[in-house]
Amino acid sequence: MNQSIPVAPTPPRRVRLKPWLVAQVNSCQYPGLQWVNGEKKLFCIPWRHATRHGPSQDGDNTIFKAWAKETGKYTEGVDEADPAKWKANLRCALNKSRDFRLIYDGPRDMPPQPYKIYEVCSNGPAPTDSQPPEDYSFGAGEEEEEEEELQRMLPSLSLTEDVKWPPTLQPPTLRPPTLQPPTLQPPVVLGPPAPDPSPLAPPPGNPAGFRELLSEVLEPGPLPASLPPAGEQLLPDLLISPHMLPLTDLEIKFQYRGRPPRALTISNPHGCRLFYSQLEATQEQVELFGPISLEQVRFPSPEDIPSDKQRFYTNQLLDVLDRGLILQLQGQDLYAIRLCQCKVFWSGPCASAHDSCPNPIQREVKTKLFSLEHFLNELILFQKGQTNTPPPFEIFFCFGEEWPDRKPREKKLITVQVVPVAARLLLEMFSGELSWSADSIRLQISNPDLKDRMVEQFKELHHIWQSQQRLQPVAQAPPGAGLGVGQGPWPMHPAGMQ
């Protein structure tokens, strides 16, 4: 008995857009795709929007579908047809390419034949047409395509079943509306963390011996005429005194689809809770909202999202983020605990090796996100040349939609990037990318009680650095720069760190 053999999906592949698209225009096989001048410099692409113009009679024979098939993003008989996604893929490719320039876009209201006209550029667009490095706004005609995709999104948003309050717990306290931040403000840190009543927890404020530690390690001495080159003095200082690294610092970047990111840095030794709610965490509601010693970080308001549909769907997810996602620091490891009803997916150094499969965070289950010990081991191997790539340290969360998947992260409604600052600094030091200046780094002094094994790792990194320096010409030290390790010169005065 004959059985049909399933067709394997075509893996995505890189295709040069210019020769492929010019060949398609020359082929005349797609209705409306044609040259508009004799020199074959300008061509027209029909550009219908389903929300305004209805389905096309030639919907199955479009340049958008052909590009999706050519790049391996659509396999007939395997993938579900998605004309809006095909159109967005080609639009993004044209926007990024230096070989094409948009000449005319429209008319877009209710035309019988909406279209775009592109110019084939010989040497890329003229300098006057250059765009800012990052443009998060939608161009003309793009909002309709975004809405086409958003219309299909709500049924697929990942929300768990409704949750009832446990009868043994007191009802949560509502925060007075007058204390809410303005709707257009960036992410708000809701005050300093409350002290942990546990006798084992470190007291709030500076750790014991803080001033003595500063006077010992950061005593400036006579300042040289100019600062040493990047990493010349500061790198060994930090490696010999690893407690100077901001081990508890986390850089958090919130991103709503198509909007500029909003970022902040938290320095709480316990971690933080990411949430969106008027419900206030209290000592009596630890089971609902986690420890009050965590930094309380509220998601930014979605009110500046211009698309009504996108803002509606984003609010659908934010409405079930009141319990939040906990990022817990434990030793030199970072963990996540999902309390919220909204499902959360993630990728990062400790994620599953199957990068193409969605990776959910199970509810109320501690999930390891990052290990500094493992990062240091991988950094040592990389510096020795035993691995080809530096160790990863960035962590990405996607709220309410599966991740990783074939959809780019920029198309997700809500994403959050988390970066352990200590890992980023160490990697930048060894790669030479760190620019040391008074405002480039804000050092935070943490508890110096590190494990012996971690101290050995720093010693080995310091040894690697010294070996690298022997292979480079020695720079002439400025007069007065002969300072001992731990004495400076530092680019900021200790008084600025109190």
Curated annotation (Swiss-Prot):
One GO cellular component, as annotated: chromatin
Numbered residues of crosslink Glycyl lysine isopeptide (Lys-Gly) (interchain with G-Cter in ubiquitin): 411-412
Result when mutating residue 446 to A: Abolished nuclear translocation
Locations listed in the record: Cytoplasm; Nucleus
SMART domains linked: IRF (SM00348), IRF-3 (SM01243)
Modification after translation: Phosphorylation of serine and threonine residues by IKBKB in a C-terminal autoinhibitory region, stimulates dimerization, transport into the nucleus, assembly with the coactivator CBP/EP300 and initiation of transcription. 'Lys-63'-linked polyubiquitination by TRAF6 is required for activation.
Biased composition (Pro residues): 168-206
Keywords, ordered alphabetically: Antiviral defense, Cytoplasm, DNA-binding, Immunity, Inflammatory response, Innate immunity, Isopeptide bond, Nucleus, Phosphoprotein, Systemic lupus erythematosus, Transcription, Transcription regulation, Ubl conjugation
Any single biological process term in GO: inflammatory response
Residues bearing the modification Phosphoserine: 158, 293, 301, 431, 435, 437, 440, 446
Span(s) of short sequence motif Nuclear localization signal: 12-18
Residue ranges of DNA binding: 14-122
Ubl conjugation recorded as keyword: yes
UniProt motif (Nuclear export signal) ranges: 150-160
Region called Disordered, residue ranges: 121-207, 478-498
Subunit structure: Homodimer, when phosphorylated. Interacts with TASL (via pLxIS motif); interaction takes place downstream of TLR7, TLR8 or TLR9, leading to its activation. Interacts with MYD88 and TRAF6.
Function: Transcription factor that plays a critical role in innate immunity by activating expression of type I interferon (IFN) IFNA and INFB and inflammatory cytokines downstream of endolysosomal toll-like receptors TLR7, TLR8 and TLR9. Regulates the transcription of type I IFN genes (IFN-alpha and IFN-beta) and IFN-stimulated genes (ISG) by binding to an interferon-stimulated response element (ISRE) in their promoters. Can efficiently activate both the IFN-beta (IFNB) and the IFN-alpha (IFNA) genes and mediate their induction downstream of the TLR-activated, MyD88-dependent pathway.
Family per similarity comment: Belongs to the IRF family.
Disease involvement: Inflammatory bowel disease 14: A chronic, relapsing inflammation of the gastrointestinal tract with a complex etiology. It is subdivided into Crohn disease and ulcerative colitis phenotypes. Crohn disease may affect any part of the gastrointestinal tract from the mouth to the anus, but most frequently it involves the terminal ileum and colon. Bowel inflammation is transmural and discontinuous; it may contain granulomas or be associated with intestinal or perianal fistulas. Systemic lupus erythematosus 10: A chronic, relapsing, inflammatory, and often febrile multisystemic disorder of connective tissue, characterized principally by involvement of the skin, joints, kidneys and serosal membranes. It is of unknown etiology, but is thought to represent a failure of the regulatory mechanisms of the autoimmune system. The disease is marked by a wide range of system dysfunctions, an elevated erythrocyte sedimentation rate, and the formation of LE cells in the blood or bone marrow.
Protein name: Interferon regulatory factor 5
